[in-house]
């Protein structure tokens, strides 16, 4: 009992430390960013204690002691669920946020509103903690909307840029589509079960849950950038690099997958929803991997790799391995945040240059960043004994031994091999070869605020997967036996991707530039999806509206139906009842002929 009580108190302390940091320290002081970063680091260190206690004892805790309100028969209370998912994800999110905040002090040092930027990052962290620990749908929805509005503010941080404003609006609008599904699910649970508490929902175990789970899947599709609602994720790269690292590594984008993992007691008995998740995740992971192959913006390549990994997590939930998907969330956070920070280091060093075609040869001038970027890329591809290997290898093994849907699983394996291709492309273009940037650029990475956060994430990218997978037992039963060739598939697929990428890069190095093929255009223009959705569809609807307004209303009704029809009717009526036909030329001609004949006759007489 004492162990559980101390664990609970420490967990609550973690949640309150960032809030105390934002409230008790003067917001206008120059030292505010340092204070916030220090508080988050303390919160991370404190969070390790209850996590270790939980690992040793395995006791879940639920705190529900503050009553909010009672609406007819529904009682709403503030309740926290400190279980496997929240206790493991909290230290991961706090450690990544700590590193990103320290990196932001270097990256955003010249920004006049850096204090406000840190305030936004802190609020984002608080809402994410609320989402992770929520025990009822209403509280979870508050955290869900909180991360949504904070992402809007952070993506549109450089509000003087049109692209940043458009990207922020795009993010909020696509997420609103997903929120409709969340609200439908909340309404269904309230109407049918009269509760929003997760334990009660899982205990009641309703039978026909297709509608609420489809709503939750739509919500996850919007938040986790699955196919159809994915364009906001690459567009969100218009925000500062620390924002990209925080939102698109460990926190906001995985919230949708986390929601589905939370509801796994309902999804594991619903084969329809599992198949939908599997197919949606497979399409997402392949499509975004293809899009990443031909991008030239270094941040967009990393963003598409995030979307591809989210598709892989969705596939994992779809084959009924939610705890494996959660493990991939935790491992993915470290190396993906590090990849973004390395990209930020390169971009900042090259005077805001993001095009990989204008980089090259950086392994000499940025040796530490090069080491971290290569390690992160190898971890992303699932290189053995790096962090990504411990989750990705298990996922591919589970896919190979699953009999759910061979088509979806096959294209997921293709997407996994493409991961190695675009990772090799970043290394090849940005770090190796000859420098392709101006010689006057001053590069200096010997700055503690830059080195230390990447160093911590580098350690996490190497060892975190080992520690997490060794200390946590899988609660979803894994495949116990499999043939040797299936066991080695994950490594073989990755190696195949590396070999293909290196061969293609070497073979095409000295080729003449040819007009791009349709396949390259399809990949480079993101499958024409933004063009169709953001340009063609609005243009078609606007042109249709214009035609209806001008042709149907103005021309047909206001012009043809009334004034012109009246004038035509009057003309026809007057022509019909009048003896004069209005042929004035004929009248003049007959008059002239008559006059001429009369004159001739007078002359002869």
Curated annotation (Swiss-Prot):
Subcellular location: Mitochondrion inner membrane
Signal peptide per UniProt: none
Segments passing through the bilayer: 8-28, 34-54, 87-107, 117-137, 140-160, 171-191, 241-261, 273-293, 301-321, 324-344, 366-386, 409-429, 457-477, 482-502, 584-604
GO cellular component: mitochondrial inner membrane
Membrane topology: Multi-pass membrane protein
Keyword tRNA-binding attributed: no
EC number: 7.1.1.2
Superkingdom as given in the UniProt entry: Eukaryota
InterPro entries: NADH_DH_su5_C, NADHpl_OxRdtase_5_subgr, ND/Mrp_TM, NU5C-like, Proton_antipo_N
PANTHER family given in the database record: NADH-UBIQUINONE OXIDOREDUCTASE CHAIN 5
The name this protein goes by in its record: NADH-ubiquinone oxidoreductase chain 5
Organism: Rousettus amplexicaudatus (Common rousette)
Gene from which this protein is expressed: MT-ND5
